[in-house]
Amino acid sequence: MHDGGVIPNRSSLFLGAALLAGQVALAPAAAAAPLLPFQQLVDAAAQRLATADPVAATKWINGGPITDPARANQVLDSVAADATAHGIDPQYVREVFTDQIAANEGVQYTRFGQWKFDPGTAPTSAPDLAESRTQINGLNKTLVDEIALHWNSLHSQGCSQDLSDATAAVVAARGLDPLYQQALASATQSYCQPI
């Protein structure tokens, strides 16, 4: 029974639901939260770190070493050239990417340790390393673009606070676990270099 003993029929329920849906659909969308100054930069660093798991899985399955100095040098040379093209200090960019590579390797070493202690959790399949490298190359470009965009801010007195705020936002948005939080802190440790 409904108010006053009247039972609504299906068509009136459908009409009511449709009207309610229309009201919800017509309601103005909440404005998206504005991005923090370094949020896209830090998010790109987090995305690049996320490649550590599939890369580690590939290396685990194929028996490859975690460190790959030739690949690291190729990445560092490429981002330094990109930095030069942007008119920013290539040595700064090399330093930032050295941290990023080391953090990625740290995650990979952690995964290898976990899989060694608990072989049942070790991967049995992994993507082709070329797929991960294509993703990494794209993120490298994004990172250099973001560094160039925020060059002055990365060298300002307010950098540390902006970096801390952006990191907290990315950690929350991506739900990063303690390992990835530590890796992100390590990957971004050289971002702020006030002049």
Residue ranges and their predicted role:
Residues 1-32:
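Secretory targeting and sorting signals
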Residues 33-67:
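Immediate post-signal-peptide N-terminus of mature secreted/exported proteins
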Residues 40, 50, 54, 71-74, ...:
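Extracytoplasmic/secreted proteins, especially bacterial periplasmic and envelope-associated proteins
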Residues 59-63, 111, 118, 150, ...:
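Secondary-structure edge/capping motif, primarily at the C-terminal ends of alpha-helices
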Residues 68-120, 124:
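Structured domain cores in non-transmembrane regions
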Residues 116-150:
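Extended amphipathic alpha-helical interaction segments
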Residues 151-195:
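Glycine-rich, aromatic-bearing surface loops/beta-hairpins
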